């Protein structure tokens, strides 16, 4: 293991690799609390990033399995939940291990091409997650504000079409991300280092890139979601009890809406710190100290935890998901009873005492 000073030196250079002068790395004064950094880098990063990776992979894979294995759960909302789980799975695969490696190793060991691929998919999956939340909020808006008129629109076919559209748009518009990132090699104090960085020296604007990422992956989608939920709340306040929608159906929609709101709020909270730090770094206002290094690691952990927390939220907030999960774990695969050939309603009613393995709420 490297000495404490070497550990700080490594992480300091990796965090400031965009600046060839390394002006923020003070080799003589930044080691006053070396024991703190040793704990942060050597223990926190592997433990937390490893935990996030395992929970994110297992949890999101279970979400996909539970919904895909139960035909009665194939509603528009659940198709969007599957897409969110897939985006989170890809984010965990392409982001978590490589960010952890960049923190603890003095060299980027994967080469220039893989650097471009990793940065590209980080941006793609981050956008895919948040714009799936936008689609989920739009789905809730239509279900609450236009429950009858939206029945012909909120179909599985249209949900799959919307999902395909956001992936095509994101995969296409994110291509410049791979172009403007790459491996940079440098030497400092007779040591060879390399990092996967934004290639500002080729004329690309780091500030422009970070501002675009901040707006497109955080501000704009959350603004759209906020408008949709404000319209929903206005409609709910003005709506009178009774009407054409049954009380049971209304309660069901409120439960699903509450779950989507919680997922969106958790996303906003988890991603806020790292978005601010990345923006501050792009403005050249970021100074390397033990506090800022620790803050950046904590912010990364918080943002990446968002990719593994959604399955936990479903388990706590959705009785349907808990029932379906138990049936996948303990029941044999269903026989072909005609479900696969018929369009499914948004919500299926449980029969009897709920012990059937074929009908999911």
From Swiss-Prot:
<keyword id="KW-1003">Cell membrane</keyword>
<feature type="disulfide bond">
    <location>
        <begin position="115"/>
        <end position="196"/>
    </location>
</feature>
<feature type="glycosylation site" description="N-linked (GlcNAc...) asparagine">
    <location>
        <position position="26"/>
    </location>
</feature>
<feature type="transmembrane region" description="Helical; Name=6">
    <location>
        <begin position="260"/>
        <end position="280"/>
    </location>
</feature>
<dbReference type="InterPro" id="IPR017452">
    <property type="entry name" value="GPCR_Rhodpsn_7TM"/>
</dbReference>
<dbReference type="GO" id="GO:0042562">
    <property type="term" value="F:hormone binding"/>
</dbReference>
<dbReference type="InterPro" id="IPR000276">
    <property type="entry name" value="GPCR_Rhodpsn"/>
</dbReference>
<feature type="transmembrane region" description="Helical; Name=5">
    <location>
        <begin position="213"/>
        <end position="233"/>
    </location>
</feature>
<feature type="topological domain" description="Cytoplasmic">
    <location>
        <begin position="234"/>
        <end position="259"/>
    </location>
</feature>
<feature type="topological domain" description="Extracellular">
    <location>
        <begin position="100"/>
        <end position="116"/>
    </location>
</feature>
<dbReference type="InterPro" id="IPR000405">
    <property type="entry name" value="Galanin_rcpt"/>
</dbReference>
<feature type="glycosylation site" description="N-linked (GlcNAc...) asparagine">
    <location>
        <position position="192"/>
    </location>
</feature>
<dbReference type="GO" id="GO:0005886">
    <property type="term" value="C:plasma membrane"/>
</dbReference>
<protein>
    <recommendedName>
        <fullName>Allatostatin-A receptor</fullName>
    </recommendedName>
</protein>
<feature type="glycosylation site" description="N-linked (GlcNAc...) asparagine">
    <location>
        <position position="14"/>
    </location>
</feature>
<feature type="topological domain" description="Cytoplasmic">
    <location>
        <begin position="68"/>
        <end position="78"/>
    </location>
</feature>
<keyword id="KW-0675">Receptor</keyword>
<keyword id="KW-0325">Glycoprotein</keyword>
<dbReference type="GO" id="GO:0004930">
    <property type="term" value="F:G protein-coupled receptor activity"/>
</dbReference>
<keyword id="KW-0297">G-protein coupled receptor</keyword>
<dbReference type="Pfam" id="PF00001">
    <property type="entry name" value="7tm_1"/>
</dbReference>
<feature type="topological domain" description="Cytoplasmic">
    <location>
        <begin position="138"/>
        <end position="158"/>
    </location>
</feature>
<feature type="transmembrane region" description="Helical; Name=7">
    <location>
        <begin position="297"/>
        <end position="317"/>
    </location>
</feature>
<feature type="region of interest" description="Disordered">
    <location>
        <begin position="341"/>
        <end position="361"/>
    </location>
</feature>
<feature type="topological domain" description="Extracellular">
    <location>
        <begin position="281"/>
        <end position="296"/>
    </location>
</feature>
<comment type="similarity">
    <text>Belongs to the G-protein coupled receptor 1 family.</text>
</comment>
<keyword id="KW-1133">Transmembrane helix</keyword>
<feature type="topological domain" description="Extracellular">
    <location>
        <begin position="180"/>
        <end position="212"/>
    </location>
</feature>
<dbReference type="GO" id="GO:0042923">
    <property type="term" value="F:neuropeptide binding"/>
</dbReference>
<keyword id="KW-0807">Transducer</keyword>
<feature type="transmembrane region" description="Helical; Name=4">
    <location>
        <begin position="159"/>
        <end position="179"/>
    </location>
</feature>
<feature type="transmembrane region" description="Helical; Name=1">
    <location>
        <begin position="47"/>
        <end position="67"/>
    </location>
</feature>
<feature type="transmembrane region" description="Helical; Name=3">
    <location>
        <begin position="117"/>
        <end position="137"/>
    </location>
</feature>
<keyword id="KW-0812">Transmembrane</keyword>
<keyword id="KW-1015">Disulfide bond</keyword>
<feature type="topological domain" description="Extracellular">
    <location>
        <begin position="1"/>
        <end position="46"/>
    </location>
</feature>
<feature type="topological domain" description="Cytoplasmic">
    <location>
        <begin position="318"/>
        <end position="361"/>
    </location>
</feature>
<feature type="transmembrane region" description="Helical; Name=2">
    <location>
        <begin position="79"/>
        <end position="99"/>
    </location>
</feature>
<keyword id="KW-0472">Membrane</keyword>
<comment type="function">
    <text>Acts as a receptor for A-type allatostatin neuropeptide hormones.</text>
</comment>
<feature type="compositionally biased region" description="Polar residues">
    <location>
        <begin position="343"/>
        <end position="361"/>
    </location>
</feature>
